[in-house]
């Protein structure tokens, strides 16, 4: 793996650290090597010893061999070096150093050099203009590579420091300029996966067996050499333990996670300033003394077996094509636009040790992805043909159906006198609209639901069939509580309402919380509207949270189509004028200003390590010591904060007698895998729980089973009766882990999946009236059999995603960090107040990313016409949809076919008619797809 730290002085760094192997021996030094295309440009080659004048010149920002400044700026506090550190797996370090396998050291050197060479491609300098900050890629660095074999705690730890000067050669200006690390850091996962894959390949070639290491969610994080136990690896990780202890102390003092810069400080402060005076033989002897005779013999056997197998294995067939297909499917399930380096990183991660990098790059040019930027493949951003077709078809549909219908609500509109002037105007604008698609847009709390009820009533009075849906169960439940018959959008699209399809002709389909709609869902909804000549009314706010699935559909329509938007602007939910003004700022995209307005009210509270206790204090105060929890909504952006806050709050509620005696329940933690992860048998472990959301061969909808074993690429689940093979490719089930959860009378539970048996819905919060022998009874009389259903967690707090569509009197936000969307959604839920508890107010305000995802059409604009070659390739990809056309709604398949059939001139003329939809960049400029055969991979 790679990490990066900034060095702002480094006066003794070469002599005291880089040239010593993390310990001091008078006769032993580490000799570095110059690396990088920038080093070659300066004529720097060969070895770097302690006191090297060229290294010292670079530290002082001087051209080696002269007193001339290298880059223009010499400011005090300037970053001197960026230290990119590439570390081997702990098992590799143990076998290479403690057990003396020098072949592994050579393999590390080669893998690290290759990985850093890939990272160098992302070197850049700042190219700021009046329009804002930008980076110009230079792809060259001046660096010294220093390989060490021990940690400061003298444990085996093979790692290489690539100490990179803060300078890069810019060909455009023919000058040396300061290096910006942003692009390199953004691609650091790719470089890390290049290293891991090459190292795994070398381990296999040297005769070792390897095993993939996974995190708690089942995702691959790396590999280790088989036979080196986790206990031994942990024993030789004392330096890591020291750093972790330092991080824990920081967390206890400040109540938040340290930043990367703070972790670097902790790392520096927790190591001995003075190097241990010891020789390498003494270090190795000390390491081996920590192993028992049995462990030492076992590791010797692992090495002996590897030596016997080295060079004798027949290399497995390359899995580059398979890995790329899996990577593309995995990433594009939740993103519309992905950079090339992220696709390559995930492809490597799919099959570590079985990928040849050059072949992977070659195969990447055959994927059939649509290039959106004019750059080399690894830097380019891509969309899939399907993704681009979905966006293009939806935008075209909205545009071509404008003004093509009768007024939505007829002529005689009778609205309630209780509506405000703005609300009345909005309702009238929707009801007189002659567009097939219209959007009622407004910030949180402007009264969209009030206007919707009026529109719904007018349509019903006019005899129009109305279908209401929402992307989430909780949002659909909110509609039902407002008196509107509603279902989830997925249920509407999946055909559960087929018995009512004849009523869709001429109907109105209302989609609430449309900002949570994905591109696929939105396009399918419009396709149904086209098929049945139905009208569509979207309600939502694209500044709030978006779908988990790929595509921010409402934002795409707002940005790229002529969508008729009826706007509500007057916020009504907040009773306090200053609170309302703060929410208005948040709704307008000024997240920092909005939070500062709340801070002016004294509602943003910094509690350092005690911020959770402060949040609990406010929750108890606002809820009458926990006896009226429905008055307060606690919002925790992360599940880690959710668990910590809930633990603190439940302890307080027990002390107040609000919670009764508890019973430990086996609850299920959903893993939220993508389809690719679900299909991969290697991701499963015995004891995992699978729940069928729809029927599949041999399984009924609602059925739950436990994974019993994994064998020969198949997953088997327990009875009843004999084991059954899990239909991995069915897409009919979800996967969860089991965890213990205490449940007591008075508890609130957040339901995380639908359960027909008990009648609870995903996103719903229920109150526990009692629990006995695994049976939970809710306050409204429903019964949850935890032997059959366990997808729930404590519900005194919800994530900001789950809070969307909710309204309460008081909000308590518990957050170390927030995105702009999370801040807006969470803080706008309250009528009377919103209190934000954070460990570090300045850190919270300084980091508020907007959370927007890119769409394919964001890269396309009218100021540039399409290059002929780019258009040819786009059309070829559209034609190649033939074998995969069933993946798309019929209407979208048709647009892909039309894209193929139309002549180039016709297409360009068509797109030129709508300037806001034109093309900013050439499409597919650097992808190598032959129009006569199309792409070789399914998308």
PLM regions: where:
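Conserved ATP-binding/catalytic motifs of P-loop helicase motor domains
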Residues: 1-939
